[in-house]
Amino acid sequence: MERMLLLSPPSLAARPERLNTILSSHSRYATDLQMLDRVAAGLVSLPQSTYDIVMLLTDVDGLGTGSTSAMGRGVIQSVVRALRPGGKFKRENGTFTSTECPDNTELMLAGLVFDDTGGLLKPDFGPENIVPLKLGKRKPVHSVSSNGTGTSGPHVNMQLSTGSMLKGQTTTIKGVGFVDFTDDPSLSEADIYSGQTDDELIDEETLLDGEDMGRPIIQPPECRPKAGKRRRACKDCTCGLAERLREEDKAARAKADATLETMKLAPKELAEVDFTVQGKLGSCGNCALGDAFRCDGCPYIGLPPFKPGEEVRLLSNDVQL
């Protein structure tokens, strides 16, 4: 028994007597009813490959404009999936023609085709057949290269087997010839592709000599640092600028350390001068002015002022100038 699905437009829900009349003309055991607006809204999902016939009911007015406007792309795809292979999609009031249904393009893009009666049919392509592809052995074949000389190369045998249709038939596709670009004809193909040849390998370290490495690097003007600013090296510097800056910093630090070493005095080089000891000289230059201008440790404390350069004798009878 054929399974049938009736798609009802929303306007028929207000006319239950007409809907019952339509349902009475079909077997209730093999007929399902779904509202078109619920299918369009995604509230109802149609089972796949279940129905032999899907019929689109017309509106209350019999024009079918409401049902046609509700047939969107999603509804059409759901209907096609619900049809069995070879199933039909029909309309209650007629056929799908270009004047009555503006969605014929969507119907055909969904996979439906028109039959002789004007209805839409889901094609039955039958079970899927697996076509094995077998590669035959390589055999040398002679071909002509672009310079007119004959070369040999492999060809591929491809056998297509599709059961009774192509049983016993073998199709051979010849490949193009391969041109040998090697200078040594004694080398085999395996040696050529494996790289095991007698060609000398060039050491990359010998490409540049000392003279090349000693040449000055010409720096573009846009890369030169501005006047008064020191150029900074990149974080991942590879041009040698970072090493050169480190050497300059190291040399400047060593020079500063050497300057500090010359200014340091050893403990043996330090001596404390006690001006209270007789025979010592004052260094302030105010000794001749009197006690008011003399230092605390001046050896002339207590003596009257004297003229600069005048000979002065202390208690020890030492001459002080």
Swiss-Prot record:
Residues 132-213 are annotated as: Linker. This is Fe-S cluster assembly protein DRE2. [4Fe-4S] cluster binds at residues 284, 287, 295, 298. The gene is DRE2. A motif (Cx2C motif 2) lies at residues 295-298. Component of the cytosolic iron-sulfur (Fe-S) protein assembly (CIA) machinery required for the maturation of extramitochondrial Fe-S proteins. Part of an electron transfer chain functioning in an early step of cytosolic Fe-S biogenesis, facilitating the de novo assembly of a [4Fe-4S] cluster on the scaffold complex CFD1-NBP35. Electrons are transferred to DRE2 from NADPH via the FAD- and FMN-containing protein TAH18. GO terms for biological process: iron-sulfur cluster assembly. Residues 284-298 are annotated as: Fe-S binding site B. It is found in: Cytoplasm; Mitochondrion intermembrane space. A motif (Cx2C motif 1) lies at residues 284-287. Monomer. Interacts with TAH18. Interacts with MIA40. Keywords: 2Fe-2S, 4Fe-4S, Cytoplasm, Iron, Iron-sulfur, Metal-binding, Mitochondrion. One of its GO terms (molecular function) is 4 iron, 4 sulfur cluster binding. InterPro entries: Anamorsin, CIAPIN1, Dre2_N. [2Fe-2S] cluster binds at residues 223, 234, 237, 239. Belongs to the anamorsin family. It holds the Pfam family DRE2_N. Residues 1-131 are annotated as: N-terminal SAM-like domain. Its cofactor is [2Fe-2S] cluster; [4Fe-4S] cluster. One of its GO terms (cellular component) is mitochondrial intermembrane space. The C-terminal domain binds 2 Fe-S clusters but is otherwise mostly in an intrinsically disordered conformation. The N-terminal domain has structural similarity with S-adenosyl-L-methionine-dependent methyltransferases, but does not bind S-adenosyl-L-methionine. It is required for correct assembly of the 2 Fe-S clusters. Residues 223-239 are annotated as: Fe-S binding site A.
